[in-house]
């Protein structure tokens, strides 16, 4: 007696095809690869020391203590710079910074300027140094006008990182910054004139002039 044959439905054929389909390469193997190496973290027996850490162990200060910044030699050098000598008036600090800039700018302008091969290269270098000092003075004035308001107290902190009280820096005020800018301009012009006097009036035996 013959049995009836029922053809499979299309959905069953599709499911069986999807179940049997696997990605195969040239050799018929699966394309997925498993890593054959294992990374292990080995704990060192020697104790490690943190070289860079927050100042005073407080991460909320927002500054880091490194072997350079915490060195007594670096602290001594920075404390002797004019910008950090709070006991000196802003006018005198500006004069000191300006003298250094004006004195050192004459040489590069005289030796590398467009008139370096002419008899007036010294005068041209001096005028170039004075011009740059004037431009820097204008920039300092613009910074002071944009950063400080007339009559407001100093924005400098009155506490050190160790908690010691100190007097607020007068440089961080509109009046103090104005004095610093005026001192910088006067010191820069004086330094340039003094360098010209030593190089080309007294005619000292400098190697470069």
From Swiss-Prot:
The modification N-acetylalanine is found at residue 41. The keyword Transmembrane helix applies. The chain crosses the membrane at residues 125-146, 180-202. Residues 41-124, 203-209 are stromal. It comes from the Eukaryota. SUPFAM superfamilies: Photosystem I reaction center subunit XI, PsaL. Keywords: Acetylation, Chloroplast, Membrane, Photosynthesis, Photosystem I, Plastid, Thylakoid, Transit peptide, Transmembrane, Transmembrane helix. It is a multi-pass membrane protein. One of its GO terms (biological process) is photosynthesis. The keyword Thylakoid applies. Residues 1-40 form a transit peptide. Its main location: plastid. Belongs to the PsaL family. This is Photosystem I reaction center subunit XI, chloroplastic.
């Amino acid at each position: 007696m013959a049995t009836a044959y029922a053809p499979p439905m299309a959905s069953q054929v599709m499911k069986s095809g999807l179940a049997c389909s696997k990605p195969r390469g040239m050799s018929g193997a699966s394309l997925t690869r498993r890593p054959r190496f294992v990374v292990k973290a080995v704990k060192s027996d020697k104790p490690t020391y943190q070289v860079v850490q927050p100042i005073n162990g407080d991460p909320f200060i927002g500054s880091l203590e490194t072997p350079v910044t915490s060195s007594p030699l670096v602290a001594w050098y920075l404390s002797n710079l004019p910008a950090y000598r709070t006991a000196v008036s802003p006018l005198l600090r500006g004069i000191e910074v300006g003298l250094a800039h004006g004195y050192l700018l004459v040489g590069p302008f005289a030796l590398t300027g467009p008139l370096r091969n002419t008899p007036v290269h010294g005068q041209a270098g001096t005028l170039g140094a004075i011009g740059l000092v004037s431009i820097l003075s204008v920039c300092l004035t613009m910074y002071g006008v944009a950063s400080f308001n007339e009559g407001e107290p100093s924005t400098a902190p009155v506490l050190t990182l160790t908690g010691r009280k100190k007097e607020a820096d007068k440089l961080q005020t509109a009046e103090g910054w104005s004095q610093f800018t005026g001192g910088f301009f006067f010191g820069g012009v004086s330094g340039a004139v003094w360098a010209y006097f030593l190089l080309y009036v007294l005619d000292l035996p400098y190697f470069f002039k």
